[in-house]
Amino acid sequence: MFFICFNKKSNVVGLQISKCSGEFCIYREPKDKTYWNNFYYMSFYVNNKKVGVNCNITDIEYSLLDIFLHGPFQVNLSEYLNVCDCVNKRFLKYERMLKEKVVNGININFSLCENKNSLVFLDNYNLQEYLGPNNVLYVFVNSVLMDKKYFSREIRNKDFWNEWRCTKMPLYVNSKRVGKFYYYSEYVLHSLPGEEPNVLEYFVLDLFLFGPVEIEVSEYEKRTKQREYNTSLYLYLYKMDLISGVNIIFDEKTTDYSKILQTQFQTYHNLDDDRILNVCVITRMRL
């Protein structure tokens, strides 16, 4: 949070004011490691790593978390109060949710940011929040390139996937079933063993089937046609009884999610012994 206290030299305690590009700007220092080490009691996570506990959090992850929770390191003086208000409200909201045990933790994920340096500014990213396993709130930060027009859509919530039935097409993500499976004849709920997809798997599945949450207008028609063609092909193969379902596969540790966000990925298909079509999503070239 920002607090301005002017001294006799017209500087600020903890902040500095100087002129840049014809306008006065306010600068602040990044929080140091000691500050973040004392964060362990707050149950904050950055890219699935617990702040104050995990030693593998990188400097760039700390910087992104700092900017997200406490605002940019540089802001125009004319915008300062609005920035403070927006950032403080967000921080206090998350702090209240943790203190009142509304959630057990908050996991802020920057893997979908196309340009992490662009987060220096407050108004060029948006958020997608989902309540995941163990009552942890997942906050996906998505950077937005400025001065371009975009089509936007909402991510499907968990209720949408829970109602996915095999009468559409049996669907799996990383070999975990999606939605409710029914017998064709009696239409009676048929429970299948297996683990439920996690919030990240649902997120990637949504992007794979329905396209990016934001896409530039000039790219919208081309990307939409390609996505609809792929989905129609899977449904056709299923209705013709050539496959018994589709399994979307990706590696959580090696996948570049920013490329999936922009549908910049390749797919590799193979059919297993149960006639399940495995669709491997690849974002990095294999050596």
From Swiss-Prot:
Q: Which UniProt keywords apply?
A: Plastid
Q: Where in the cell is it found?
A: Plastid
Q: What Pfam families does this protein map onto?
A: DUF613
Q: Which GO terms describe its cellular component?
A: plastid
Q: What is its main location?
A: plastid
Give the UniProt family note.
Answer: Belongs to the A.longa ORF167/ORF288 family.
Which named protein is this?
Uncharacterized 34.5 kDa protein in rps12-trnP intergenic region
State the organism of origin. Answer: Euglena longa
